[in-house]
């Protein structure tokens, strides 16, 4: 053969062998990483890619990539949850349109957090949700020298939480919200949250005592505290009934009595979707997974609520004394006096809620 042609052929073969070797080496490293991620021994020989187990593993890996969170803070899946529960929640949230909120979140960070503007006010407009509240705000008879607690029902979750915080922000005073510890994922709002733990453990009790003491100190310093005594989203007692708040926790009453605080009752109108009510009859996993969907389907709509007359501490003492149960019942009645149903009907439905929701 012509020497130049032979040299060219040898060069091509050499380059081809080098490239093949590099690709094989890279594939081996990738396979080892994948096997380590799957909890397998990377020193074992590679499995047959045609095996059912390997095909299932590849499908599962693609599913994980599919539901990878672009906005990992906005999810009701918690790191401590079982793996399957986390995957179900994230998958349902992904299908329900969770990623719709990524761009508004980034704009919120860029245009409001980074520039030191008001934090809560732009949240709902950025996702095209309006609020319509009846009643005077700020309350004309608000005593600026007395501790203030805002108490509200909890029909939606995220939506009424943001709406109540926006009202607190409008007062021009520092504010905090008592919130379930598992929901403190968004770093930009952690400083305005006080985490409550509802698990029946000593650690939870110690945390709640610490939070209560912190809330009392903040109230004395003029910080407004926002609280949803139900601790969870309103649910219907049956698949096709009307939603009612979960039983209110006496934690709120204890805090108000200790701080000698005045209270503003707020009632948010409406309820979550029928699908949410149906899955709530069976367990927490799908119920949690649908909460982002409930916010997504409210886009383009108007959230409505009513602000009740302020309750001075003197009136609280007159109606409840130092009895925490009486006080929480009194506040429940004042908030739900703004509802379209009678208090007796609401209480009856509350008593028929699934047992696991009343704990």
Predicted regions and their residues:
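Membrane-anchoring hydrophobic helices of lipid-metabolizing enzymes
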Residues: 16-18, 22-148, 161-163, 170-172, ...
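Residue-level signal for well-ordered alpha-helical scaffold segments within enzymatic catalytic domains
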Residues: 122, 163-166, 170, 217, ...
